[in-house]
Amino acid sequence: MRSATKLFKNLSKSVVQLKTVKPVSSLNFGYIKTRQFSTSTTDSSNLFLNNNNQFQNFTFPTKQQIRIRKPAPAFKGQAVVNGEFKEISLDDYKGKYLYLFFYPLDFTFVCPTEIIAFSNAAEEFKKAGCELVGCSIDSPFTHLAWINTPRKEGGLGGINIPLLSDLTHQISKDYGVYIEEDGHTIRGSILIDKEGLVRVITMNDNPVGRSVDEAIRTLKALKFTDQFGEVCPANWSEGDKSMKADPKGSKEYFEAVNK
């Protein structure tokens, strides 16, 4: 009888102690475990201790954003090429520079002016060893309808560059240009080199169209630095004086341009 009474008292004491345990603050979650980040498109889950002393999964995306000198995210999708549907991928452009530009939507306002301007400059890009690809979240059918619409009606009226379809929005998200609240992309441009590395990232807010001349200038400047190992100062254009990136070389440059 005494043993049973003693056991009951111990149990009662334990219950009282449990009731008086100070809860973990909701502002101070106990960190339990973090999985190492990866560049996989899958999410990683971290385990935290919540204010009820219970384990809970917190899931968030760990896809790294594109970075300069890092590999461009692989892509594959249906495109309209020379009026035909065709699957294209990043692998198709190995050994070449690729200027991949995103625009918000087909049948809009600034977008056709950009695409036509890039299309008109396609030969100059090709002479510099660079291919052009435009991309939006529209379907390939919408792309084709827009291409076949006369320019005087706001269409493209035939173009010399592929238009890639990103219906799932995955390519746009991988390249960091998708705006969730808008449901489409901003004007993002990515220059990828022959090794598949990202070399230039530019982003315009949607009211402002891009400069094709600046895209060509930057492409030629990068090609020059890749080939000759010298650097290009501000506003450098093909044929301008470049600079050796060392104290002696920079002094020679500054003396030459400041006579």
Curated annotation (Swiss-Prot):
Please name the GO terms that the record assigns under molecular function.
Answer: thioredoxin peroxidase activity
Family as reported in the entry's similarity comment: Belongs to the peroxiredoxin family. AhpC/Prx1 subfamily.
The UniProt function text for this chain reads:
Thiol-specific peroxidase that catalyzes the reduction of hydrogen peroxide and organic hydroperoxides to water and alcohols, respectively. Plays a role in cell protection against oxidative stress by detoxifying peroxides and as sensor of hydrogen peroxide-mediated signaling events. Regulates the activation of NF-kappa-B in the cytosol by a modulation of I-kappa-B-alpha phosphorylation.
This enzyme's EC code(s): 1.11.1.24
Under the heading Gene3D superfamilies, the entry gives: Glutaredoxin
Q: Which GO terms describe its biological process?
A: cell redox homeostasis; hydrogen peroxide catabolic process; response to mercury ion; response to oxidative stress
Got a GO cellular component term for this one? endoplasmic reticulum
Q: Where in the cell is it found?
A: Cytoplasm; Endoplasmic reticulum
- What residues sit in the active site? C111
Question: What does the record say about induction?
Answer: Up-regulated in gcsA null cells devoid of glutathione.
Q: Which UniProt keywords apply?
A: Antioxidant, Cytoplasm, Disulfide bond, Endoplasmic reticulum, Oxidoreductase, Peroxidase, Redox-active center
Per UniProt, residues of the Thioredoxin domain are: 66-224
Q: Which organism is it from?
A: Dictyostelium discoideum (Social amoeba)
What InterPro entries does the database record attribute to this sequence? Answer: AhpC/TSA, Peroxiredoxin, Peroxiredoxin_C, Thioredoxin-like_sf, Thioredoxin_domain
Lineage, please? Eukaryota, Amoebozoa, Evosea, Eumycetozoa, Dictyostelia
What is this protein called in UniProt? Peroxiredoxin-4
Q: How does it assemble?
A: Homodimer; disulfide-linked, upon oxidation. 5 homodimers assemble to form a ring-like decamer.
What reaction gets catalysed by this protein?
a hydroperoxide + [thioredoxin]-dithiol = an alcohol + [thioredoxin]-disulfide + H2O
**Other information:** The active site is a conserved redox-active cysteine residue, the peroxidatic cysteine (C(P)), which makes the nucleophilic attack on the peroxide substrate. The peroxide oxidizes the C(P)-SH to cysteine sulfenic acid (C(P)-SOH), which then reacts with another cysteine residue, the resolving cysteine (C(R)), to form a disulfide bridge. The disulfide is subsequently reduced by an appropriate electron donor to complete the catalytic cycle. In this typical 2-Cys peroxiredoxin, C(R) is provided by the other dimeric subunit to form an intersubunit disulfide.
